Amino acid sequence: MSTNNTIKTPYEDLLRTILEQGSHKDDRTGTGTTSLFGQQMRFDLTEAFPLITTKKVYWKGVIGELLWFLQGSSNVRWLQKRNIHIWDEWASEEGELGPVYGVQWRSWPTPDGQHVDQIAQALDILKNNPDSRRNIVSAWNVADLNNMALPPCHLLFQLYVADGKLSCQLYQRSADMFLGVPFNIASYSALTHMLAQQAGLKVGEFIWTGGDCHIYDNHREQVLTQLSREPRPYPQLTLRKASSIFDYDFDDFTIEGYDPHPAIRGEVAV
């Protein structure tokens, strides 16, 4: 891993670009947004771990949600037992969300009544056919969308291996830039580390591609506060190897050198 921890600010740069160039749009939640379409950020995982520093990111929630996805679960009870409540607004009284991310990742239904474990399949491709251009995991199951509490925002990622390094590109159709995107950057960067470790690879880049990249009207002041802060160096992630991609736990992830500015609260647009 490189120790060249030059301060880079692709996330903050995109926030500024949206404020400067975005169009004001109405949205499903009735909140209103400033929106820009088709943007990209790149993060070199060989240098550092992209945990945003201009506000504190809820790291426990990042890892908890990722581990929950990897379980293939559709129920928030596992998260709630660990005092993680990021999905509560969308869950039924029984804690159900329908066939959301984890279900699609681990148990995509096929026409013959079988299921595809996309994560296991992706890892197998990394090990046995790393040059494949078909190593894609999708949560956007059109037949299941109406049964989901919330259709997937970060809906598809592709894995790419070159020179023994694993890179991941995410496509996010709807990007809540203030609340959601810092979380998503950290989550998929962590997943890239996990997959690389299990496949015997090093990490490369995490590339984030967004469709409707928006700042909600009720987050505008928070974003301006965030942009007034001086970015600090990204931390480093140390990952203890688990017996499989599905057996990681909170204690396997150690973040070192994370010195963020204080958290900034914002309401979720439901």
Curated annotation (Swiss-Prot):
UniProt protein name: Thymidylate synthase
Domain of life: Bacteria
Pfam families named in the record: Thymidylat_synt
Active site per UniProt: C153
Positions that bind (6R)-5,10-methylene-5,6,7,8-tetrahydrofolate: D176, A269
Family: Belongs to the thymidylate synthase family. Bacterial-type ThyA subfamily.
UniProt xrefs under InterPro entries: Thymidate_synth/dCMP_Mease, Thymidate_synth/dCMP_Mease_dom, Thymidate_synth/dCMP_Mease_sf, Thymidylate_synthase, Thymidylate_synthase_AS
Protein's cellular compartments: Cytoplasm
Biochemical pathway: Pyrimidine metabolism; dTTP biosynthesis
Function: Catalyzes the reductive methylation of 2'-deoxyuridine-5'-monophosphate (dUMP) to 2'-deoxythymidine-5'-monophosphate (dTMP) while utilizing 5,10-methylenetetrahydrofolate (mTHF) as the methyl donor and reductant in the reaction, yielding dihydrofolate (DHF) as a by-product. This enzymatic reaction provides an intracellular de novo source of dTMP, an essential precursor for DNA biosynthesis.
Reaction(s) catalysed (UniProt annotation): dUMP + (6R)-5,10-methylene-5,6,7,8-tetrahydrofolate = 7,8-dihydrofolate + dTMP
Quaternary structure, from the entry: Homodimer.
Any single GO BP term: dTTP biosynthetic process
PROSITE patterns assigned to the protein according to its UniProt record, in alphabetical order: THYMIDYLATE_SYNTHASE
GO molecular function, one term: thymidylate synthase activity
Residues the record lists as binding dUMP: R28, R133, R134, R173, S174, A175, D176, N184, H214, I215, Y216
Presence of keyword Ubl conjugation: no
GO cellular component: cytosol
Coiled-coil region: none
Record-linked SUPFAM superfamilies: Thymidylate synthase/dCMP hydroxymethylase
PANTHER family cross-referenced by the UniProt entry: THYMIDYLATE SYNTHASE (PTHR11548:SF9), THYMIDYLATE SYNTHASE 1 (PTHR11548)
Enzyme Commission designation: 2.1.1.45
Xref: HAMAP family: Thymidy_synth_bact
Keyword field: Cytoplasm, Methyltransferase, Nucleotide biosynthesis, Transferase
CDD domains listed in its UniProt record: TS_Pyrimidine_HMase (cd00351)
EC class of the enzyme, as a word: transferase
